[in-house]
Amino acid sequence: MAIDGILKQGFITTSADKFLNWAKTGSMWPMTFGLACCAVEMMHAGAARYDLDQFGIIFRPSPRQSDLMIVAGTLCNKMGPALRKVYDQMPEPRWVVSMGSCANGGGYYHYSYSVVRGCDRIVPVDVYVPGCPPTAEALVYGLLQMQNKIRLTNTIAR
């Protein structure tokens, strides 16, 4: 937490914006939107070896309970409206992590007629995690970058 000053009496002085962002980074609740093989690596990152719980990241089954969406895998044209619908059900503020080459830009199936060439054409993406499939370490690094981005966001003026 970026603390502006600590007084000798045991008080901490900081802005409300920094405090709220600190609280949000310590309690990110992602909703999994696993579409292909990248979802297996996402499950791997949530398992005991990498333990995302230590960062305050707890997977939620419902979009109404989550503030972060991880889009992992190949996004087809038929799945595009469902992705947007789930994104619209998430409460504000909400963030999106695009995981894998297929979610980032179509990947191996870029020239296929039925593939959306990047989920950023459907929903705004905050962090891109590259790889085919990206490793669990890459996803953890991307989530830590998401936490840094949230920390630097101006929450109250939003």
Swiss-Prot record:
It comes from the Bacteria. It holds the Pfam family Oxidored_q6. GO terms for cellular component: plasma membrane; respiratory chain complex I. InterPro entries: NADH_UbQ_OxRdtase-like_20kDa (IPR006137), NADH_UQ_OxRdtase_20Kd_su (IPR006138). Binds 1 [4Fe-4S] cluster. NDH-1 shuttles electrons from NADH, via FMN and iron-sulfur (Fe-S) centers, to quinones in the respiratory chain. Couples the redox reaction to proton translocation (for every two electrons transferred, four hydrogen ions are translocated across the cytoplasmic membrane), and thus conserves the redox energy in a proton gradient. NDH-1 is composed of 14 different subunits. Subunits NuoB, C, D, E, F, and G constitute the peripheral sector of the complex. PANTHER family: NADH DEHYDROGENASE, NADH DEHYDROGENASE [UBIQUINONE] IRON-SULFUR PROTEIN 7, MITOCHONDRIAL. This is NADH-quinone oxidoreductase subunit B. It comes from Bordetella pertussis (strain Tohama I / ATCC BAA-589 / NCTC 13251). The lineage of its organism: Bacteria, Pseudomonadati, Pseudomonadota, Betaproteobacteria, Burkholderiales. The gene is nuoB.
